[in-house]
């Protein structure tokens, strides 16, 4: 799970979710050198169901839909032929990360529709990260449905393609939220719970490995090739 690939804004106090382009390139090389097969998210669900028996599978996801995905991450993914999924905050496409405190996280540009359409033509897939990136558990039932369901409707209308996967903002979810995600027509949802994907995992509580600026080469390799990351706990 990535957020930003690039340099943080000068005013940004919290820089943990930024990975340098050089480090991202190295990490993609590590996936190839370690014998991993990078697959679309649907194949991860097939692995969970037991329909795929290849053990060294990986999927690459990006939360929020920042412009630096297109500028810095996508060229590397294209070079390696790796698929990836970007989870978009649908009502803020082309704007900035208005959900974050500007003095802590800074203001960062989100991709506009023209860029998203270009990436779609290149095979990048998109998922939903709600309309405005709220803490879903703090919303009224009506507002929760609006954030989850209408984000899917908006994205499918603009992309002219199914939006099948959801990602919980801040890793904030409960049984009520999961039920709304299911009822909205998604086939799977991704958390910020750190860990490896196992057979028989719940399709709507899929864990991920958070890649940060502190994820040095040794840690990255450990996460790929061992249970080091499999701690089964929540992170933002």
Regions found by a protein language model. Give the residues of each.
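Surface-exposed cleft-lining segments at the edges of enzyme active sites
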Residues: 95-107, 134-141
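C-terminal active-site subregion of NodB/CE4 polysaccharide deacetylases
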Residues: 1-61, 67-70, 138-236
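A short, conserved beta-to-alpha structural element at the edge of catalytic cores
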Residues: 47, 81-103
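Short, catalytically relevant binding-site loops at active-site mouths
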Residues: 91-94, 132-134, 172-173
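Acidic (Asp/Glu)-rich catalytic clusters
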Residues: 32, 75-82, 109-128, 182
């Amino acid at each position: 799970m990535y957020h930003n690939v690039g340099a943080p804004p000068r005013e940004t106090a919290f820089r943990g979710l930024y990975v340098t382009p050089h480090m991202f390139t190295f990490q993609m090389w590590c996936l190839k050198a370690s014998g991993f097969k990078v697959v679309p998210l649907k194949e991860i669900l097939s692995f969970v169901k037991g329909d795929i028996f290849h053990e060294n599978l990986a999927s690459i996801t990006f939360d929020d839909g920042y412009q630096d995905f297109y500028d810095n991450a996508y060229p590397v993914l294209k070079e390696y032929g790796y698929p990836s999924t970007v989870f978009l905050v649908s009502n803020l496409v082309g704007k900035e990360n208005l959900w974050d405190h500007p003095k802590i996280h800074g203001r960062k540009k989100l991709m506009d529709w023209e860029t998203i359409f270009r990436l779609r033509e290149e095979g990048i897939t998109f998922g939903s990260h709600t309309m405005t990136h709220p803490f879903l558990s703090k919303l009224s039932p009506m507002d929760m449905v609006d954030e989850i369901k209408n984000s899917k409707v908006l994205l499918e209308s603009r992309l002219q393609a199914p939006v099948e996967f959801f990602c919980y903002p801040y890793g904030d979810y409960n049984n009520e939220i999961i039920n709304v995600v299911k009822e909205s027509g998604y086939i799977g949802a991704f958390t910020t719970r750190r860990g490896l994907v196992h057979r028989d995992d719940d399709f709507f509580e899929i864990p991920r490995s958070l890649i940060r600026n502190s994820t040095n080469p040794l840690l990255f390799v450990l996460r790929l090739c061992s249970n080091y990351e499999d701690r089964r706990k929540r992170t933002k």
